[in-house]
């Protein structure tokens, strides 16, 4: 399967009214690690505690530079005879080079897998229907399973959905078995919309090495260990926590505008009768009736704050709650 495989794009839907949908994750990439030093190496690289991660678990975490700024956020899990992380396609090449740079003193193999298929499945009755394809599926108590040449991750935000690391043959089997259901396909913009609503950060290359993990809510998502010892960026990340230095947080906005803001641009916020630049956009997605934005803003903004896209005086956006905050 070609690295750029994707299903045709259709306008994404909210999780509230999403029909059963099989989603190609062409904007994500899979990097694997194995070898006798893989645990020690990854413990020195990532912000999570690699040693405490169980085989049937995954975690959100970050890979940072020495200043604690995030190269990228990742899904991290046990995979085959080692570990895997799923990261954004736009950053994987740079991340791969950095991982290999720091690996010269370790016995560890690091590989990018373009022959694996990354799929998402979400929407109406997704649990029941996936259970008709696989003999067992993951849940909140066991969020990762490995079966039929496939690894399946369960995500419960913003609604039940699953991420699959699989093969072309299994993908074809899934499509064949789903023909009797009213299933639609979509590309990764649908998964992006779900991640925005869930509050799972999206770091593409343009925003790489700009933000501390706390500003991305990674601590709230359980992706930072403060007990594991040294790793890249650890001093800055710990100092930010213990000196209460973080003044930013990841937010979810919903509203309307004449254009979709791009990653790295600023928004405007209304303060009294004036508009001021604020925040940094991480991702945005057009839905059928509105636009969703993921943005890093100052912490503790009033819930009734009004924001808009720069240069679009008719646009209006409001904060939406994130369930883990």
Curated annotation (Swiss-Prot):
GO molecular function: folic acid binding
Record keyword Cytoplasm present: yes
InterPro entries (alphabetical): GCV_T_N, GcvT/YgfZ_C, tRNA-modifying_YgfZ, YgfZ/GcvT, YgfZ/GcvT_CS, YgfZ_barrel
The entry's keywords: Cytoplasm, Folate-binding, tRNA processing
Residues noted as binding folate in the record, renumbered to the chain: 28, 191
Cellular-component GO terms for this entry: cytoplasm
Subcellular location: Cytoplasm
Record carries keyword Cytoplasm: yes
Major place of residence: cytoplasm
Biological processes per GO annotation: iron-sulfur cluster assembly; RNA modification; tRNA processing
Role played: Folate-binding protein involved in regulating the level of ATP-DnaA and in the modification of some tRNAs. It is probably a key factor in regulatory networks that act via tRNA modification, such as initiation of chromosomal replication.
Family indicated by similarity: Belongs to the tRNA-modifying YgfZ family.
HAMAP family, sorted: tRNA_modifying_YgfZ
Protein name: tRNA-modifying protein YgfZ
